[in-house]
């Protein structure tokens, strides 16, 4: 008989010794692993985009050998994003595979490069390929395209993805060659359809021995699988994990509309950022400005698109940037007539430091998009412009080195992270919703709060950013970047950049500054910033609270010129001046009359020539100021007393020889009183001061911006000393009446 025979008495022994080889001549040994130098990665790139450089960087990290086809060629494969095409890639593969057709031991891995990153190395790829036990393995997809009519021709798959994806495949060189040699179409024909027809042909599939990576062990296509793939940190490494199949794919492909998700994974994979080491690529390809003799030329685009609080300070910050002024040019678009006075004051200062300043005012009636296009052109059309730095007026840059830091990071587009104080609102989005608007990425809060520090590839950034001049003159040379459908200008810019394949980065490696809230900025007053204590408390404090205020609690600078009369710094010069200006602009001083309809009962026993905070709509601001800044001092000087921070009477008093020069002795209707000097004795007026009669103690040289704090009723009978000439202003509150 033909075949092999086994004697009955030896059957048991044979089964024990060779349980899987009942026939002589069968190979019982596992196949030896393929050496990593026998793996060749092939990709196609007719241009070197940001995505290509990221792909090559990940390949270099794992020591892949990569052959790039098509470099320097014109792309004739169609618009792969929105239509069929890609045949040029198959034609190039056909040409190159002829050189490897007889190398039986060579494994060829083809993958896209613009939207692919490696998450594992050659050894892992080859091990998984061998385990698949086929000659060629294609990436698998849950979505059938481009011809859905071919669904019935696919083999049935009970577990895993059923359809082929041409974005990645791996196989022995002779077998890959057999596939691509069948190509006889045009460069703009569809590569996906070509490979699909090879696979669904049962004879070809079996003859070449092709399978799909059904469970995404090697290739992970993200389109249609967004909910399957998560970021995983384990053993000091970052991987993308398919939670449906419990696999760790090696090549991650952000095909179709999933490029934003791929960018998110690319921030971590392969080990770009880990929990143990933080950002491992932050110093990659950076530049050192301290080593250059001449700094790059920067055009700064400034945009004032709505009434904005604290604008003079914003403009002054531009002049304090740590950057050579001779290398700067300024483009300013001001949409608001309200701010023209601020622009004029700034220009008169800046023109002595910055040679080129272009101002486009509200009379031009430009839309925001038109203005931003003009600002970008200000750099684009200047061959000497190395960088374009766009800054909106609602950005507070507290780091003078911001511009240098961004340039040194050496990215095409990069923004510094700025947030609203105490909030998660920032100038970037970590993800987009399906309709292209805000969605919160998994890492957004950690980035905003500084728990993860690095340089992050993001889909949207705004308010403040730096763009390379050569990028504006190459990939982004279209003038109308800020106009797109009905999108806001910032969203239009970001969408255009994404579609051009230009990565946008946000850096939180340093503290750069913050964002102002402009939503409720009321410009009906004379000094409108005074009302910003709720919307922008940090900025309000910086502008209006005395810089020595914190020393009250750290250096014990509170003075006591009279018994239980405490004296401390509270207001800045600007606060004093603006409060006086506001009252004078309002102008309805009471005249120091006893009959006063503003108070309960309509009669004031000891009247002053004053204006109440309530009259200028400043009452709520003033009471909040008392709770935030006066109450802590109260607790320090009147130990054990906790103020409610409430006052019925809050007002600015005006003393002058012509109207009211002094105030007779009286007790205040308060538990304690604050009395803040708003101008300077000796400069603005002579005389004045306060005398506490019971202690025979006078204070005749009040300091501007400093406050007295003393008990009100019962103990501290006092009087206002005569003003001899000039005008004296004080702000008074009767607290806890």
Curated annotation (Swiss-Prot):
InterPro entries: Collagen_mod_GT25, IPNS-like_FE2OG_OXY, Nucleotide-diphossugar_trans, Oxoglu/Fe-dep_dioxygenase_dom, Pro_4_hyd_alph, Procol_lys_dOase. The modification Phosphotyrosine is found at residue 323. Glycans are attached at residues 63, 209, 297, 365, 522, 696, 725. Homodimer. The modification N6-succinyllysine is found at residue 704. This is Procollagen-lysine,2-oxoglutarate 5-dioxygenase 2. One of its GO terms (cellular component) is collagen-containing extracellular matrix. The lineage of its organism: Eukaryota, Metazoa, Chordata, Craniata, Vertebrata. The gene is PLOD2. It comes from Homo sapiens (Human).
């Amino acid at each position: 008989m033909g075949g092999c025979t086994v004697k009955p008495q030896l059957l048991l022994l044979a089964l024990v010794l060779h349980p899987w080889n009942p026939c002589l001549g069968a190979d019982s040994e596992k196949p030896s692993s393929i050496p990593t130098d026998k793996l060749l990665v092939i990709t196609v790139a007719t241009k070197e985009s940001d995505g290509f450089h990221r792909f090559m960087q990940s390949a270099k990290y794992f020591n892949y050998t990569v052959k790039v086809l098509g470099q320097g060629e014109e792309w004739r494969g169609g618009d792969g994003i929105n239509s069929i095409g890609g045949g040029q890639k198959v034609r190039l593969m056909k040409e190159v595979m002829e050189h490897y057709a007889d190398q039986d031991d060579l494994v060829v891995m083809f993958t896209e490069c613009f939207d692919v990153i490696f998450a594992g190395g050659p050894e892992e790829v080859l091990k998984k390929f061998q385990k698949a036990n086929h000659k060629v393995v294609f990436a698998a997809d849950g979505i059938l395209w481009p011809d859905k009519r071919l669904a019935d021709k696919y083999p049935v798959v009970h577990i895993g993805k059923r359809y082929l994806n041409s974005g990645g495949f791996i196989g022995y060189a002779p077998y890959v060659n057999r596939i691509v040699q069948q190509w006889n179409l045009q460069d703009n024909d569809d590569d996906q359809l070509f490979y699909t027809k090879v696979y669904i042909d049962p004879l070809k599939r079996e003859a070449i021995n092709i399978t799909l990576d059904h469970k995404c062990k090697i290739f992970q296509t993200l389109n249609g699988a967004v909910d399957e793939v998560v970021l995983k940190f384990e053993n000091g490494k970052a991987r993308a994990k398919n939670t449906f199949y419990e696999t760790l794919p090696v090549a991650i492909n952000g095909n179709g509309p999933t490029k934003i998700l791929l960018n998110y994974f690319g921030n971590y994979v392969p080990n770009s950022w880990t929990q143990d080491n933080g950002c491992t690529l932050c110093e990659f390809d950076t530049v050192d400005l301290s080593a250059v003799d001449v700094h790059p030329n920067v055009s700064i685009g400034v945009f004032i698109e709505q009434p904005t609080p604290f604008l003079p300070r914003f403009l002054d910050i531009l002049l304090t940037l740590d950057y050579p002024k001779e290398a700067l040019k300024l483009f300013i678009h001001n949409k608001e007539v309200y701010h023209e006075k601020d622009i004029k004051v700034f220009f008169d200062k800046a023109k002595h430091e910055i040679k080129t300043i272009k101002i486009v005012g509200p009379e031009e009636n430009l839309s925001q998009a038109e203005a931003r296009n003009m600002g970008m052109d200000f750099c684009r059309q200047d061959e000497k412009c190395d960088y374009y730095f766009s800054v909106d007026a609602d950005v507070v840059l507290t780091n003078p080195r911001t511009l240098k830091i961004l340039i040194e990071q050496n990215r095409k587009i990069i923004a510094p992270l700025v947030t609203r104080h105490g909030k998660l609102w920032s100038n970037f989005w970590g993800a987009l919703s399906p309709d292209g608007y805000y969605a919160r990425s998994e890492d957004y809060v950690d980035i905003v709060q500084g728990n993860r520090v690095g340089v992050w590839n993001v889909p949207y950034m705004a308010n403040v950013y730096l763009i390379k001049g050569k990028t504006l003159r190459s990939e982004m040379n279209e003038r109308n970047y800020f106009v797109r459908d009905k999108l806001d200008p910032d969203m239009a810019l970001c969408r255009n950049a994404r579609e051009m394949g230009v990565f946008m980065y946000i850096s939180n490696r340093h503290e750069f500054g913050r964002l102002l809230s402009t939503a409720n900025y009321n410009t009906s007053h004379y000094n409108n910033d005074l009302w910003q204590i709720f919307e922008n408390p940090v900025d309000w404090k910086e502008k209006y609270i005395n810089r020595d205020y914190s020393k009250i609690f750290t250096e014990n600078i509170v003075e006591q010129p009279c018994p239980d009369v405490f004296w401390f710094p509270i207001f800045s010069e600007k606060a004093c001046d603006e409060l006086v200006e506001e009252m004078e602009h309002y102008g309805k001083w009471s005249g120091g009359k006893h009959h006063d309809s503003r108070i309960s009962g309509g009669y004031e026993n000891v009247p002053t020539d004053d204006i109440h905070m309530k009259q200028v709509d400043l009452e709520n601001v003033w009471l909040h100021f008392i709770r935030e800044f006066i109450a802590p001092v109260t607790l320090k000087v009147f130990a054990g007393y906790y103020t409610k921070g409430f006052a019925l009477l809050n007002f600015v008093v005006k003393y002058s020889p012509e109207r009211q020069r002094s105030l007779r002795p009286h007790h205040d209707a308060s538990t304690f009183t604050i009395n803040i000097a708003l101008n300077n004795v000796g400069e603005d007026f002579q005389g004045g001061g306060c005398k506490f009669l019971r202690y025979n103690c006078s204070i005749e040289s009040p300091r501007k911006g400093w406050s007295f704090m003393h008990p009100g009723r019962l103990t501290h009978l006092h009087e206002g000393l005569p003003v001899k000439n000039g005008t004296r202003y004080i702000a008074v509150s009767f607290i806890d009446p």
